[in-house]
């Protein structure tokens, strides 16, 4: 009996394995993550941008977002006039619209964008860093 109680105590002390959390509209963390991503996207697409969230999930100190950028009031972004095309010379045929995928990591001080891509023409995040983002990408190859 004593061995069983020790086993139960050990199991209870282990961290629970939780599923990723979908952040609902209006959640403070959702706003914080989108505001962390916004300056990077505005550098590439021009300001201002708003995000339409397809998916935004958090798993502990990691997060993964799939969003589409638009102008205020829902106006579409003309990719031809964006800094990533005009300033950086990115060919339009290599950009599949203002869709963004982004990975985040929470440090002691704040959330940071680890990696993001705008207008990917492939599923670049397939199996991306499964060691750290596996729970967030379980349906995407991890």
Which functions belong to the PLM regions below?
Residues 98-134, 140:
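Short beta-strand edge/turn micro-motifs at domain boundaries
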Residues 13-17:
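N-terminal signal peptide c-region/cleavage motif recognized by signal peptidases
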Residues 55-106:
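Mature extracytoplasmic domains of secretory-pathway proteins
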Residues 1-4:
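Positively charged n-region of N-terminal signal peptides that target proteins for export
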Residues 45, 62, 68-70, 132-142:
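N-terminal glycine/threonine-rich, aromatic-flanked beta-hairpin/loop signature
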Residues 36, 40-44, 71-72, 107-110:
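Structured segments of extracytoplasmic/periplasmic soluble domains
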């Amino acid at each position: 009996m004593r061995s069983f109680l020790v086993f139960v105590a050990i199991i209870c002390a282990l961290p629970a394995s939780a599923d990723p959390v979908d952040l609902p509209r209006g959640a403070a963390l959702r706003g914080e993550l989108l505001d962390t991503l916004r300056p990077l996207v505005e550098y590439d697409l021009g300001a201002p941008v708003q995000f339409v969230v397809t998916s935004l999930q958090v798993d502990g100190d990691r997060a993964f977002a799939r969003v589409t950028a638009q102008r205020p009031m829902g106006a579409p972004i003309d990719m031809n006039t964006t800094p990533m095309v005009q300033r950086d010379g990115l060919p339009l045929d290599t950009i599949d619209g203002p869709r963004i995928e982004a990975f985040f990591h929470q440090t002691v001080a704040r959330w940071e964008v680890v990696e993001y891509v705008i207008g990917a023409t492939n599923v670049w995040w397939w199996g991306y860093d499964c060691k750290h983002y596996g729970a967030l990408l379980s349906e995407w190859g991890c």
